[in-house]
């Protein structure tokens, strides 16, 4: 069975998807981390995004792996553990631009579909239920008010990167979220959008456990007629 969880930034997708997967014994895949890993590789190797041939050559030879170490997922690019590095400022500021490129999305879509073969999994991202797994058994789309999402983003960044975010403000986070929403929803290839058959949950005033409970209720009641 494949469950997809999509939605804009700071709606709690990763945390919710991970907890859901743990509660039902499924494998959790954070596709945002995959895009960050690829972005890290592109930046490290100084790949010119305006040169399609150079980019495609890198994608053809891109080495990516996921390993579970001490119960945590670690992401490897060219055999280097980049799990912490992909959360850095440079990757964060570049990942939207990289992820909007058709060749990049096609490469990662192929990887994601390969990872899904023969397993029960929860895939979290922005186009999981619309493009990557259009026949997923269960599709979830998370939303949230902009002010709540901005506060979540601010708290997350200032907690993880206290030194780098000394000048960060809540207003700046709100501005960046609005900009990111617009960019993701209007990009030419595989834009962020809600699947017609998705179960929509507004996470603004709900705890993580409450959202997971809603998804489990939905899972128990839906008739999963679509093949995985």
Curated annotation (Swiss-Prot):
Stretches that traverse the bilayer: none
A Gene Ontology BP annotation from the UniProt entry: pyrimidine nucleotide metabolic process
Residues at which ATP binds: 7-15
Compartment(s): Cytoplasm
Chief location: cytoplasm
EC number: 2.7.4.25
Catalytic reaction list: CMP + ATP = CDP + ADP; dCMP + ATP = dCDP + ADP
NCBIfam families: cmk
Protein known as: Cytidylate kinase
Name of the gene: cmk
């Amino acid at each position: 069975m494949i469950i997809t969880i999509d939605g804009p930034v700071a709606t709690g997708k990763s945390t919710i998807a991970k907890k859901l997967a743990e509660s039902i014994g499924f494998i959790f895949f954070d596709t945002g981390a995959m895009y960050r890993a690829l972005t890290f590789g592109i930046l490290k190797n100084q790949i010119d995004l305006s040169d399609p041939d150079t980019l495609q050559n890198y994608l053809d030879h891109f080495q990516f792996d996921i390993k579970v170490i001490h119960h945590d997922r670690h992401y490897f690019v060219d055999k280097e553990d980049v799990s912490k590095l992909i959360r850095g400022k440079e990757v964060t500021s570049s990942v939207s631009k990289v992820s909007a490129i058709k060749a990049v999305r096609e490469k990662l879509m192929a990887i994601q579909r390969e990872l899904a073969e023969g397993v029960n999994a929860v895939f979290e991202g922005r186009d999981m239920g619309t493009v990557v797994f259009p026949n997923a058994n269960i599709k979830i789309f998370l939303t949230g008010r902009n002010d709540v999402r901005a506060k979540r983003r601010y708290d997350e960044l200032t907690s993880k990167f206290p030194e780098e975010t000394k000048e960060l403000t809540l207003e700046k986070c709100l501005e960046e979220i609005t900009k990111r929403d617009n960019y993701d929803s209007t990009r030419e290839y595989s834009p962020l959008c809600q699947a017609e058959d998705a179960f929509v949950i507004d996470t603004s005033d709900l705890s993580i456990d409450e959202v997971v409970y809603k998804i489990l209720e939905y899972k128990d009641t839906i008739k999963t007629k679509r093949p995985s």
